[in-house]
Structure formats: C-alpha cells, structure tokens
Regions:
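Cysteine-dependent PTP/DSP-like catalytic domain, specifically the C-terminal lobe
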Residues: 292-308
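Core catalytic lobe of class I
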Residues: 1-296
C-alpha cells in the first residue's frame, strides 16, 4: 500500500487576520509532525445493507474491509447503574478503563470496514465533576494515537440555551464550590488514512460507485461550523434511555457521504442513524447487542420508510 506525506497549502487565514484570504500555511503545519497519508483507492461495495445485526460490535466480521463510507455513532454512556440496567447486561463494562478498551476494539473494527478516506463521527458526553473526565479527549487519543485515524475536528453539540440544563450547580451563588452545568456534548470527527474520499467522483460514476452529493449549499455553510444547535430527543417518546436526535446523524450523513453510500452505526440503539440514512437516500448497517432494541429500531426504521 503506497503512502504519501501530507504537505499542502490551504486557503485559511493567518492567525490575527480578520478576513479570509488565500495563503500558503505550510510554515504553520511544518511545526507539527506530518501525518502519513495512505494512497489507497480500494473501495468495495457493501453486500450487507439496510440491516441491523444483533451482536457485539467488537466483531463486525459480517462487513467486508473497505466497504463503509461513514461510521456515525453514539456509544453507550458510562453513566451509572440505572442507565446500564436499562441497556441490558453486558452493554457497558464495569470499569472506565475496560470501557475505553471496549471503545478501542470497536473503533479498530470500524477502521477495518471503512473505505480509505471514510469518516467516523463519534458523539460523546463528558463525565462527572468530582473530578471531571473528558471522554472526548480519551476518544480522541484512541482514534488518533492508538489506531492512526486522522483527526478532522470536533463539533460542539449545543442541546439547550441559557439557564437550561441540569440543576447541579454546586454552591449556589457562592464561590465556595460552583459547578459547571452541561449544555453540550461533543462529536469527534476523523478519517481513515486520508482526508479526501478514495476514488474521484468521475471515476466513481464510471465504476458504479456512489458519487452524487445531496447537501444544500446553505446547510453546507452552516454545518461546517463547529457548533450545532439541535434539540435533544425524548427518551420516553423513543423508548430508549439515551437516543441522540435523528438530525445529528442526518447532518453527518449529508456532509460526509454521497447518495447511495453505506453508513454504519456499531451502537445502533433505537435506530436513529438508520432513520437518517433512509431519509437521505443512503444505506445503513447497524449492530446492537440487545434484541429488544434491534426490534425497536427495525420498527422505527420501517415507520420512517412508510412516512417518507
């Protein structure tokens, strides 16, 4: 497999320049170790489509190498016994270190099935306040340092406004021990081996691979900003303890994939990613440990098909 070193100019502005202007920023990037990029155009059509598999997402052997365009997922929270009981036995490891090992194993399988230049978008909530634990940082370390993904950035998902959010403010109106309250989660974005999608669009069309964009230009401008305001989903309405809103995977799908691409969610839950895929003309593959949630997701996906 051929490799190439990333060393290209960009069109971003210099630090301290208020307007956007073209320039060669290689001097800035020269201060960091250059990532090794894979010059690999291997893309395999995915034979497993529009299916939710019941099983452990550390084993994605049913999915071939280099066949997935995008992984978008929200792993189960490491959030305590009540939540873990609702998810079912074995869904969340007992210790935080075991939890990170589980995520690493899943993301390693995601690397295998992603096509070169395929993207992964991981929605995570940071943990606790005594002390605070940055799960976003730990996931970034796993993706970048352990597995070799190329980090593309981090989106801040704003779930509420102003004085909303939880009421655990610590010492109210006092400097004794004020506590920051969560209004946001993170979406860590990374790529497999290269920043661009493997195979040029003109070649994709000739080979019968997905090549058509569907994103609206106004949406593109809004969604390439690193803050997204999206209302959270109702757990009671969906029937799952922690569903992310369908709008979140929909934006990732429109932004990072072509019409007809296959999207994977290794923690499918109530089927939000599959619903977003159906509504945007993409295929989906899901993995879910709990058969009851597989059935729930399949019902909700079918409802989405019927309503479109």
């Amino acid at each position: 497999m051929a490799e190439r070193r990333a060393r290209e100019g960009t069109a971003t502005s210099e630090f301290g320049v208020s307007k956007r202007e073209n320039h060669d920023s290689s001097s800035f990037y020269d201060r960091f170790p250059a990532p090794t990029l894979l010059d690999d155009d291997t893309v395999v059509p995915c034979p497993v489509q529009d299916t939710i598999l019941c099983g452990d997402s550390r084993d994605l052997s049913a999915i071939p190498d280099n066949s997935i365009a995008l992984v978008v997922t929200s792993p189960p929270y490491f959030a305590g016994k009540a939540y873990e009981t609702e998810l079912g036995e074995g869904a969340v490891p007992a210790s935080y270190l075991d939890y990170l090992v589980m995520l690493r194993d899943v993301f390693a399988e995601c690397w295998r099935v992603l096509e070169p230049g395929g993207r992964i978008a991981v929605n995570i909530a940071n943990l606790g306040r005594k002390p605070f634990r940055s799960l976003a940082s730990d996931v970034t370390t796993i993706l970048q340092n352990d597995l070799g993904y190329l980090l593309r950035g981090e989106i801040v998902w704003i779930k509420a406004e102003g004085a909303s959010g939880n009421c655990a403010w610590g010492s109210y109106a006092s400097a004794a021990n004020p506590v920051l309250r969560d209004l946001t989660e993170r979406i860590v974005i990374a790529s497999k081996g290269r920043f661009d999608r493997a195979v040029k669009r003109s070649t994709r069309e000739k080979r019968g691979l997905p090549f058509e964009n569907s994103i609206d230009p106004d949406d593109f401008m809004a969604w390439t900003l690193d803050t997204w305001k999206i209302a959270p989903e109702s757990a009671k309405r969906v029937g799952h303890p922690a569903p992310f809103p369908v709008e979140l995977p929909r934006r990732c799908i429109e932004l990072f994939t072509y019409v007809g691409d296959t999207v994977l969610d290794p923690f499918m839950g109530a089927g939000q990613t599959a619903i977003a895929a159906v509504r945007t003309g993409r295929h989906y593959v899901g993995m879910e440990l709990d058969p009851d949630y597989v059935a729930l997701a399949e019902r909700r996906v079918e409802d989405a098909r019927q309503s479109d």
